[in-house]
Amino acid sequence: MLKKFISLTIAAIGLGAISTAPAVADAVRIGYQKYGTLVILKEKGLLEQKLEPLGFTVSWTEFPGGPQLLEALNVGAIDFGTTGEAPPIFAQAAGAPLLYVGYEPPAPTSEAILVAKDSPIKTVADLKGKKIALNKGSNVHYFLIKALEKAGVAYGDVNISFLPPADARAAFESGAVDAWAIWDPFFAAAQAATEARTLADGTGLVSNHQFFLSEKKFTADHPQVVDAILAALEEIDAWAKDRHDEVAAELSPKVGIPAPILKSAVERLSYGLKPIDEAVIAEQQKIADTFFELGLLPKAIKISDVIRKPTS
């Protein structure tokens, strides 16, 4: 059962067709999502400028969530990507060759548990016995666990439907599920389109860090490329943190969400790239231990085993 769970967590949802062909020479393959600073970096074209002197081009691939992105890294389809806190934990437990190389500050209000505006569910405690949609192995998986814990509801006392964001929204709108645990920009879009009510966000429960992860061999072979990506992220963070209107306007046609709605997600995002430190390693270890104690990981893991070592 555990093997089945971990396999589904990082390998499910339409990734069987991902190519495992060797990387194109002198190209870095980056996985991104609709959420986070990587998508901003992509739209500004800054990374291409940074990598040109190194003789590298950039290939971008969008994923619906972190688990799917890290399965791509695991099978050799991408070299670098960004996810939240939970996906690399499941991926590490499954043997994915990843390294943590950087992270962003907390953004706890960027994820939430939503219910329909006229739902009789008023508190997290009311979720007992209810059906909740979420993307398996994602940040909101851990967020839901912590929200239930605070409300005195056992994880086993709710019924979870593991669905990627698009399918989860359809289930939520049709009433097939009672609640939906989701992150931005899907969170912001659902608030606007469905008038969904926020039952709880991550405030006081989770940090909701954004992590940057690199494939081990690629990192060892091309440390200067990884450093250039991080330098570009640091630069784009500094540019974006006070330009929420501009960022929303630029990303709107790319992610398919109107700029005024997307601005809410941009404002809830955190900015300021940080090197991996002992404090965030300890936070990640706590999350990993929680999943293991609930029987959701096949083995205990040590986050410190997959941290990029300083290059100098």
Task: Label every PLM stretch briefly.
Residues E43, G65, L69, G84-P87, ...:
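Stable alpha-helical elements in mature extracytoplasmic
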Residues M1-T9:
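Bacterial N-terminal signal peptides that target proteins for export
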Residues T9-A17:
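Bacterial N-terminal signal peptides
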Residues A86-P87, I160-S161, P165-P253:
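Pocket-lining segment of extracytoplasmic ligand-binding domains
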Residues A220-L296:
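Secondary-structure end/capping motifs
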Residues D26-V153, S161-F162, D178-I182, L199, ...:
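Short, glycine-/small- and polar/acidic-enriched structural segments
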Residues S19-A25:
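Sec/Tat signal peptide C-region and signal peptidase I cleavage site
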Residues D289-S312:
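Conserved C-terminal helix/tail region of periplasmic/extracytoplasmic solute-binding proteins
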